[in-house]
Amino acid sequence: MNRELGLWGEELAAQYLRKKGYKILERNFHTRYGELDLVCEKDDNIVFVEVKTRRSTRFGSPEEAVTPRKIGNLKKAAILYLKSTPRFFPEISFDVVSILVEDGKSKINHIINAF
């Protein structure tokens, strides 16, 4: 995947989530375990959102790129984020926003509490 497509997908996902009532707290939060694409707040809870954007399903759907190893790293990165903020969140969840771009159209699939 090229970086430009990924950044475009993250922006589209952020716009989509804002319309759904999410507040974007951080974008591209870097840790030694990898990057948290979007860190959001919804109903006083924190939501870590992994965004996957693809131009085709030839190698699987975008959400299939969220492997067990990736999930483990996202959870470790989330712990580091939580340690870095003084805020308390009663609930923590992980969502996936997959974006498939085909024939000039984008299809968004938002998986709430994906793992």
From Swiss-Prot:
User: Which CDD domains does this chain map to?
Assistant: PoNe_Nuclease
Which family, according to UniProt? Belongs to the UPF0102 family.
Q: Which Gene Ontology molecular-function terms are recorded?
A: nucleic acid binding
Source organism (scientific name): Syntrophomonas wolfei subsp. wolfei (strain DSM 2245B / Goettingen)
Lineage at the top is: Bacteria, Bacillati, Bacillota, Clostridia, Eubacteriales
What InterPro entries does the record tag this protein with? Restrct_endonuc-II-like, tRNA_endonuc-like_dom_sf, UPF0102_YraN-like
Signal peptide location: none
- Note the PANTHER family from the entry: UPF0102 PROTEIN YRAN
Q: What is this protein called?
A: UPF0102 protein Swol_1475
